């Protein structure tokens, strides 16, 4: 990535790289070097009438310029997964609404993923009213999509990843300010990350059983939109009082988390979401907020983040925060207006929908998704 920045700064069309000058294991270094260069080169320009032609020639010489085939396959899969995530996040809201998003996931069947799409009729039958309530003000449909990858011959428990897919978030009746609302196309970044991950696992034929679950909605004001004060019943059977329709991501995740735990009985669940602005106040764009009910899983995610540069910082969960989301009229409310701790109370809310003590972690990635840097 740094070398790519160097290239952009110097604006030369051709570079020569001598692999013999590298002291580290070149078979490890070269693959990562080229992978980082490719990731940094990503541009989303499909709506530009005139596209820049920034072709650079990089010649690798020396006796240590080979990359093992298995590493080539792995890096290519990682690249395609990451680029697919970026493409989804970069699409404008008028293009990638929930109907279109769900359709785009169907071709993933061709690479070995089992795709199942639950439309509003199926979701209503299942009782996923917290998810459905978020999208009821939109003319677009709401969906839950499951993506299964079976890389092991046995029936071992899968790893589960759940993503928030609010394709555009106006805030609903609790309308957001106009300034920067255009960035709310990124409010589906958690779901896009899960989709990219599942695509990468399938392309590299990963030896693991995994499932990705994404809730796809559009949060719009309208004659049928959810109102502050509404009470809805979740898939879990727990009821939620909606105090603010702009605290909608947790409502989408609530049904998705319970369904994932109940249907797949996974080893663990990791959910990813642009859930709160409060996490940006706390951590900026350098760290994702990590909340977990399991120390082992938390440590694994922290270690993985340090190795890859995708850093996380563990934040607190504690029963003492429960009073901030308890409701007088329902089992809980979707936001608290006093007491602060916005990111923690959001995670505390999600934890209530993990019913069987499954190891679970919540990654609040708002800082990364909305970063301008």
Protein language model regions, located:
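Short amphipathic alpha-helical segment within the helicase RecA-like ATPase core
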Residues: 1-165
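A generic structural signal for tightly packed, nonpolar segments enriched in small/aliphatic residues
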Residues: 12, 85, 99-373
């Amino acid at each position: 990535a740094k070398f790519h920045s160097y290239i952009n700064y110097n604006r030369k069309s051709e570079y020569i790289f001598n692999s013999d000058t590298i002291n580290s294991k070149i078979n490890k270094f070269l693959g990562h070097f080229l992978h980082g260069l490719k990731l940094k080169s990503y541009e989303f320009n499909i709506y530009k009438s005139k596209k820049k032609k920034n072709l650079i020639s990089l010649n690798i010489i020396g006796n240590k310029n080979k990359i093992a085939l298995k590493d080539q396959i792995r890096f290519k899969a990682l690249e395609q997964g990451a680029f697919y995530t970026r493409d989804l996040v970069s699409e404008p809201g008028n293009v990638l609404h929930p109907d279109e998003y769900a359709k785009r996931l169907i071709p993933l069947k061709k690479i070995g993923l089992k795709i199942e799409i639950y439309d509003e009729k199926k979701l209503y039958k299942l009782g996923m009213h917290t998810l459905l309530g978020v999208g009821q003000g939109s003319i677009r449909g709401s969906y839950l999509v499951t993506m299964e990858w079976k890389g092991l011959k046995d029936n071992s428990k899968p790893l589960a990843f759940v993503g928030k897919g609010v394709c555009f978030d106006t805030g609903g009746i609790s309308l957001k300010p106009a300034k920067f609302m255009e960035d709310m196309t990124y409010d589906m970044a958690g779901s896009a990350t899960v989709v990219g991950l599942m695509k990468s696992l399938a392309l590299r034929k990963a030896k693991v059983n995994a499932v990705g679950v994404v809730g796809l909605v559009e949060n719009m004001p309208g004659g049928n939109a959810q109102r502050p004060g509404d009470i809805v019943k979740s898939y879990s059977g727990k009821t939620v009082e909606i105090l603010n329709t702009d605290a909608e991501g947790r409502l989408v995740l609530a049904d998705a988390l319970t369904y994932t735990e109940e249907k797949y009985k996974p080893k663990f669940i990791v959910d990813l979401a642009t859930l709160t602005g409060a996490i940006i106040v706390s951590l900026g764009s350098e760290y994702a907020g990590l909340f977990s009910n399991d120390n082992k899983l938390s440590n694994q995610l922290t270690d993985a983040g340090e190795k890859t540069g995708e850093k996380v910082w563990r934040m607190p969960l504690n029963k003492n925060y429960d009073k901030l989301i308890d409701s007088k009229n329902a089992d809980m409310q979707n936001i608290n207006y006093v007491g602060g701790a916005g990111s923690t109370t959001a995670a505390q809310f999600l934890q209530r929908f993990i019913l069987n003590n499954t190891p679970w972690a919540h990654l609040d990635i708002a800082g990364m998704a909305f970063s301008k840097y």
